[in-house]
Regions:
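Conserved, mostly hydrophobic/aromatic
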Residues: 18, 46, 61, 78, ...
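Active-site mouth loops of central-metabolism enzymes
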Residues: 19-29, 82-94
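N-terminal binding-site loop/beta-alpha segment at the start of enzyme catalytic domains
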Residues: 1-76
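Distinct, well-ordered alpha-helical segments
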Residues: 58-69, 100-101, 124-132, 151-163
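Short, acidic/polar
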Residues: 27-38, 91-106, 155
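Short helix-capping segments at alpha-helix termini
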Residues: 67-75, 107-108, 136-141, 161-164
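Active-site groove signature of glycoside hydrolases
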Residues: 107-122
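Conserved small/polar residues in nucleotide/adenosyl-binding loops
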Residues: 164-172
Length: 172
C-alpha cells in the first residue's frame, strides 16, 4: 500500500486510514478478521473516535486485539478523536484527559499514536487544550496530536501554546 508522511513528525503511514466508525456491532471474531484483513493489505492505520458506537467500536477492537497474540501493538498505528459529547462539544482539559483514559481502556493499549480533537470548541480557551496535550504527552499516553475540522488560525494558536507539535491530517 502506498504510504504518506503524516504531519511534521515524519511518520510514514498508509495513505488510507481504516475507519472504525461503524464497527460497534461486530463480534470479537468478526473484528479479529477485520483487523487481520486490513493488516494483510498493508492498512495498519486505524481511525477511531470515542463517540463511534458510544465507545463500542473501540471496545470490540480492543477485545479482538488483546485476545490475539499474533496481533502486535507496534504493527499498528492507532488514532482516536475526542471532544464531542451528546449534544455538545467539550474540549475542556478534564474531558480530554478523561476521554483519553477511556479510549486507552477500551482499545486495551497503553498509548495512542495520534489523538485528534474532533471539532473546535469555542467555549474553551486554547491554553486549556494545550495544557491537556502537554499532560498526555509527558505521561506517555499520546505520542502525537492533531486536529480535525479546524481552521488554520485555530491550529496555529494551539501550536503556539503547546510544548508539542499539532497538525491536521492531510485530506486526499
Amino acid at each position: 500500500m502506498k504510504e504518506t508522511v503524516l504531519g511534521s513528525h515524519l511518520r510514514k503511514v498508509p495513505s488510507i486510514a481504516v475507519g472504525c466508525m461503524r464497527l460497534s456491532e461486530k463480534s470479537k471474531d468478526e473484528m479479529n478478521h477485520f483487523i487481520h484483513s486490513a493488516l494483510e493489505q498493508g492498512a495498519y492505520f486505524f481511525d477511531h473516535a470515542d463517540i463511534y458506537g458510544g465507545g463500542m467500536s473501540e471496545s470490540v477492537f480492543g477485545e479482538a486485539f488483546a485476545d490475539d497474540p499474533s496481533l502486535k501493538r507496534e504493527d499498528m498505528y492507532l488514532q482516536s478523536k475526542c471532544g464531542i459529547r451528546q449534544g455538545c462539544y467539550d474540549l475542556s482539559k478534564e474531558h480530554i484527559l478523561e476521554s483519553v483514559d477511556g479510549i486507552l481502556k477500551r482499545l486495551q493499549t497503553d498509548y495512542l499514536d495520534l489523538l485528534l480533537l474532533h471539532r473546535p470548541d469555542a467555549l474553551v480557551e486554547p491554553e486549556e487544550v494545550a495544557a491537556a496535550f502537554d499532560v498526555l504527552f509527558e505521561s506517555g499516553k499520546v505520542r502525537h496530536f492533531g486536529v480535525s475540522n479546524h481552521k488554520p488560525m485555530q491550529i496555529a494558536l494551539l501550536q503556539k501554546l503547546s510544548l508539542i507539535h499539532i497538525s491536521e491530517p492531510t485530506r486526499h
